[in-house]
Amino acid sequence: MAKNIRIIKEAIFTKLNDDSALRQLLGGGGRILHKQPPEDANYPCIIYEVISDADNVFNEDISTGEVTQSFFRVTIFSNSEKTEESDAIEARIKELLHGDRTLDNDDVICYYCYRDNLLEPFRDPETLTWVTSIRYKVTWGVK
């Protein structure tokens, strides 16, 4: 299979969406979204997005793209009064994504996926939601 960024996006979505504990923390299905929550979003919800992607990071000849290193962001939105809800969601996401082989599936070989950065939650004054942004670094290839 040829490399396509869609493959890693699908692996991230599937890993998050297929976890019943995370769906329970989110209050049901349909709350894991790509890029931006709609104005009428149900809270809590999370978005995910690939923010950078570099091919063949372990070789000077990057033309083959055999190993890819990507950074992606998962952002949690919660309209709870306190951060406990978003903290619990973040902890579950870390359990799912942080480590070796966490995004392996039929198309992806995930060499490792580690939480690279966690920003302290902030309260959006317009939407009155807590926003927690987490950046992950993943090294992967296609099968």
Positions of PLM-derived features:
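Sterically constrained small-residue positions within well-ordered secondary structures
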Residues: 39, 63-65, 123-127
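Short, well-ordered turn and helix-capping elements at secondary-structure junctions
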Residues: 52-55, 80, 119-122
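Oligomerization/assembly interface segments of phage tail-like spikes and tubes
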Residues: 64-80, 93, 130-140
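Short, cysteine-centered beta-strand-loop-beta hairpins and adjacent loop/turn segments enriched
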Residues: 55-58, 77-83, 140-143
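Small/polar-rich, solvent-exposed N-terminal microdomains that initiate assembly or binding
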Residues: 1-62, 84, 100-106
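Acidic-leaning, charged glycine-interspersed low-complexity segments
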Residues: 95-143
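Divalent metal-cofactor coordination and adjacent catalytic microenvironments
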Residues: 49, 68, 111
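Extracellular/virion structural assembly segments
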Residues: 79-99
